[in-house]
Amino acid sequence: MKTVKIRGYCDRLSAAPGETIRFYVSADTSDGSYEAELVRLIHGDTNPAGPGYKEESVKSAADGSYPARFQRTQFGSFVEVPDASGALLADGAFSVHTFLWSTTPGRGRQGLVSRWDDERQCGWSLAIEEGRLVFTIGDESGTTNRVISDRPLFQEVWYSVTAVFDPVQKTISLHQKSVVNRTNSRFGLVVPLDSDTTVSAVSQVSPGDSRTSLLIAGLGEAAAADGRTWCIANFNGKIDAPKLYGRALSSEEAMKLAEGTVAEPWSRLAHWDFSAGIGPDGIPTDHVVDISGNGHHGQCVNQPDRGSTGWNWDGHEENFIHCPQQYGALWFHEDCLDDCRWDKDFEITLPDGLKSDFYAMKIRYGDSEDYIPFFVLPPRGKATAKILVLASTFSYLAYANEQIMHKADIGQAVAGHTPVLNENDVELHRNLDYYGLSTYDGHVDGRGVQYTSWRRPILNLRPKHRQGFGSIWELPADLHLIDWLNHNGFDYDVATEHDLNEQGVDLLRRYNVVLTGSHPEYQTWANADAWEDYLADGGRGMYLAANGMYWIVSVHPEKPWVMEVRKELGVTAWEAPPGEYHYSTNGRRGGRFRGRARATQKIWGTGMSSFGFDHSGYFVQMPDSQDKRAAWIMDGIDPDERIGDGGLVGGGAGGYELDRYDLSLGTPPNTLLLASSVEHSVVYTVIPDDKSFPHPGMNGGEHPFVRADITYFSTANGGGMFSTSSISWLGSLSWNNYDNNVSRMTRNVLTQFMKDEPAPLV
């Protein structure tokens, strides 16, 4: 097995001719050079039963050799408060107060609030070590004094913590008090927590100038020559309302702070209110406000969770917009990553006339290679074809660098077989801090990952990549469609779901027909609006997928490369904690479209019904397939033919994830049910959405909901919608050298939908 020695990413998902994309690359060493080459991606599946891998070299100004270098990644979330003037040095008496809720108190050293140079042991820091609070003072020579709490912190329990440096009394002290209410902590009022304490120690030194920024949720590694403070010892958990006072608080004042009061506001050097800025659209910013009036504002790094319940949350309000004073916490994780922040290696300005399509910058370093994918749009505001392929970029981000098969306890059970790992899986396991997590993973403290980013190497978003369950997924699977369109001579444009979110229905209206990829599971509310309006106004859609439009997502308005999802009960790897179902990036409730009265059936005709990853079935025709109104769809297919009984994904066209026709969930009543899939194993099961009381008989061998339905309905104003309801459908297009009834049916519908005339009426 080869090892990964080079990896990269680009700054944006898509661009039109005349626009620039920047590329960022890191190699294992800084020796030698690497080669870069622009390629058009055509077929990403190496399955020997298919046409094989296909790419096309495209000459570009960015092609060539570049010096190899290693680029460090800052991992973990924190807040940085620049302090070049030294105003937060606190070289006299000072006190630090914060509320904290630790999720991993026993996991090594973790900074809470600090102005500290760890290399020189200089400055001051409030931190956790071995499950206890530690307050440290270090002078310019590296001599340190510290005081350690004599009571350990309980996991997921809120505390009020005050650290005091008193140079007159030559003491340092810690005040620790639990502030548990009925809802804010793991335990309630009935638990007799023995964790309140005050401890002091003698201090013979005063804090030296660390020449670092003040950090919240970490420690400064060193005073960097380039002015950048690298954060180490990241904290896992929540911090609420940290404050820095320019005097030594008394024990009585320290304990009073546990009630949420502010001791002599005039004496504050800084007071960071993480809820400041919450408004009708959430708190879609990295800015952290200092409300002391001294202007020591901060910046979030690596997207800590915002809109999180604070120390005083009482459970009566679940929307942070309505009660910002109880949502003053940031939830930090040592394994957050919203941007690798590498230096640029090279860029490319897309030339006029470059075909709209799936592309990648292919980079090679010795025997190691990587592909950095992106999407070329048609010229802004124009269409160059009648067909639009909509790349499922929200779902690409949701699954970006997922580690389900080698980290999730249920991964093998869900797959129904032993996982098959490759070099990218091993690389993710060994060097996670290059890559970050997916929304199917949990942070190290167990919290589900709710933010995901494009600005990092995404190893499973590569042609040729195979998931741990043995087949291709997302972008490589969508290339089955691109290859088929090229093989059949169809002209098409490409856009992304991010582009649709920005441009709305106007983007779709430029085209006679819009095609999905294999798995458009994650969508914004605006994208659902655009699809519904497009179809209702006479547009034509082909949903060549399953499990589409299932989870609602939000895009960060200041960082469009960041996507947010907050999950509820359903087909999910995790559920958002109580009180945290609303997106920080737009203030709206997260969860499933179906849970917001918008089941996929209402727009695309079918919606998520079952999943399983051992093998795929095929379709048998239903009576509607012989309806004369469906003759144009079934042209060339005999009435008794099985549809899709071969393919590259699981061996058939009906598999992996399945959607069903369901009038009770909004399938239009004029819909034709053309075919339904069969031969699904017990690995396939009914989704939680359709289970009230679990009982035997919920699997593919027994339950009627375990099926995919091929449907067609016409809409008002000449529109039409065709749905195949299976993730593995596209994998059958090239089966038997493209000579099969999946290809034939898809071609029948696409050829009709391209025409400048209304879709056939039903």
From Swiss-Prot:
Explain the induction of this protein: By N,N-dimethylformamide.
- Report the InterPro entries cross-referenced here: ConA-like_dom_sf, DMFA2_C
Q: Which reaction does it catalyse?
A: N,N-dimethylformamide + H2O = dimethylamine + formate
> What Pfam families does its record include?
DMFA2_C
Say yes or no: keyword Hydrolase present. yes
Q: Which domain of life is it from?
A: Bacteria
UniProtKB keywords = Hydrolase, Plasmid
Enzyme class (EC, first level): hydrolase
Q: What is its EC number?
A: 3.5.1.56
Molecular function in Gene Ontology? N,N-dimethylformamidase activity
Summarizing the function annotation, the protein's role is: Hydrolyzes N,N-dimethylformamide, and to a lesser extent N,N-dimethylacetamide and N,N-diethylacetamide. Has no activity against the substituted amides N-methylformamide, N-ethylformamide, N-ethylformamide and N-methylacetamide or the unsubstituted amides formamide, nicotinamide, acetoamide, benzamide, acetamide and acrylamide.
State the oligomer form and interacting partners: Heterotetramer of two DmfA1 (alpha) and two DmfA2 (beta) subunits.
Protein name per Swiss-Prot or TrEMBL: N,N-dimethylformamidase beta subunit
High-level lineage: Bacteria, Pseudomonadati, Pseudomonadota, Alphaproteobacteria, Rhodobacterales
